[in-house]
Amino acid sequence: MSHQERIASQRRTTAEVPMHRSTANQSKRSRSPFASTRRRWDDSESSGASLAVESEDYSRYPPREYRASGSRRGLAYGHIDTVVARDSEEEGAGPVDRLPVRGKAGKFKDDPEKGARSSRFTSVNHDAKEECGKVESPPAARCSARRAELSKQNGSSASQISSAEGRAAAKGNNSLERERQNLPARPSRAPVSICGGGENTPKSAEEPVVRPKVRNVATPNCMKPKVFFDTDDDDDVPHSTSRWRDAADAEEAHAEGLARRGRGEAASSSEPRYAEDQDARSEQAKADKVPRRRRTMADPDFWAYTDDYYRYYEEDSDSDKEWMAALRRKYRSREQPQSSSGESWELLPGKEELERQQAGAGSLASAGSNGSGYPEEVQDPSLQEEEQASLEEGEIPWLRYNENESSSEGDNESTHELIQPGMFMLDGNNNLEDDSSVSEDLEVDWSLFDGFADGLGVAEAISYVDPQFLTYMALEERLAQAMETALAHLESLAVDVEVANPPASKESIDALPEILVTEDHGAVGQEMCCPICCSEYVKGEVATELPCHHYFHKPCVSIWLQKSGTCPVCRCMFPPPL
């Protein structure tokens, strides 16, 4: 059987097989300007059914007068079989009335009533086709219709028909593969979900027939229309998404405006509707910015940049970061010469005086903010002369600043005052004494400052050295000397027990001479006191003399010699060795 005979048999078969369509009981709202009335199987009419192929939802390019009428676009509801009907007609596969319901593998469902209903359905679809002709067809449809007209005018031979049917069959197979992947065969304006219904019959052994496009009709119970926005990426329809895009931009701007107003930074990209609303907004913005301006009062030129701030504030930018970054760059570039001019060596004023100067500079800057230049901080020459006159002769400004700083810290730095130079000193016995008790005979080791002075004077050397460091150096020197003396004394007292001299015998102790202290002798052996008990010799006491010619009280030296047979002063052995 040739390809043309197969096509002819297909047309005869599809003409005899009645159409089984599930009627959609629910009505969909159609935005099409054409009538969407169709006939049901029981000779009744219903409006808004899914067979309205001229609906605006299924037309890729509706008339321009309808597009400009103001109706909103972007929603699509309907069955996919209507799109198949148009596609099959545009591609030259045959009239619309040849759309049977396909089962599982190519079997068609039969109906005892064949003729009348099929003819009524064909007439209804032909009416729809005539109305659809009035609508502006898509480019692909126009091209296919133009090709069909040219083929009719030229007399369309059988070979051309067979090639057209082959292309239609190939497109049908591609559409079936896309359908399995949930993709529409032709990307339309509003794709809808495809779901099959009805029972499928097993495949028979009959001869297969080439069918260009056959799809399952979606039943009403499984029909789930999806909502899509119109993308409209073509150049000839530039304003198809303008309405919903404008609405989305308006809502986003409104939400951003509320958020910015909540933090005191509302972007006024559009003017408010009412003047009182604008005044209230400006008052609210001013009230929100009061604490921020108070925090930046340390910067005297803050008010000088308010005009730049509000100029960037009124601009319609994509984000807040752009104008904030630009404002910071502008502010820093104009702040650099001021910071460089303030790096000179000068006296630092007190806190109250600094606040007064900042307040005065801020008022001057705000008064001259309308001009192009910004006033710089210039100290009054009269104030400089007064400050120089207040300095004592030979006083160093750095020392005066340190004094002010230490006095402003108050009692929190009381320990700093306790370790000033000369506050503590060591006496001759390496003991710490208060400076107030020996202020008249204060001795300072000025040799410690020889390395720092270098001929410039001690006062200038002290000004460049931390007083705490100098005090620590002096104290460390005294402590080192005292430690050396103590170690030497301990070494002298360290006596090995094994080599210690044994105690003197009782006979040798009793053999010591006794010297009676009289009034005539005020001193015994030119000594006024006993080295052991450190008490003066008194009239009537008994003293004694060791072979080394050291004098002691007789009872004191007797006790000492009973423990160690040596002189307590010179460590000479007693009794002396023979």
Curated annotation (Swiss-Prot):
Catalytic activity as recorded in UniProt: S-ubiquitinyl-[E2 ubiquitin-conjugating enzyme]-L-cysteine + [acceptor protein]-L-lysine = [E2 ubiquitin-conjugating enzyme]-L-cysteine + N(6)-ubiquitinyl-[acceptor protein]-L-lysine
Residue list for modification Phosphothreonine: 231
Skewed-composition ranges (Polar residues): 151-163
Gene Ontology cellular component terms for the protein in this record: cytoplasm
Enzyme Commission designation: 2.3.2.27
Zinc finger (RING-type): 530-571
Domain of life, per lineage: Eukaryota
GO biological processes: protein catabolic process
Coiled-coil region: none
Record's note on what induces expression: By fear memory. Differential induction of isoforms.
Distribution of this protein across tissues and organs: Expressed in brain, liver, kidney. Highest levels in brain where it is found in many regions including cortical and subcortical areas and in neurons of the amygdala. Weak expression also found in testis. Also expressed in developing embryo.
Post-translational modification: Substrate for E2-dependent ubiquitination.
Quaternary assembly: Binds ubiquitin-conjugating enzymes (E2s). Binds, in vitro and in vivo, the MAGE conserved domain of MAGED1. Binds weakly Necdin, in vitro. Interacts with UBE2D2.
Protein name per the record: E3 ubiquitin-protein ligase Praja-1
Organism per entry: Mus musculus (Mouse)
GN (gene name): Pja1
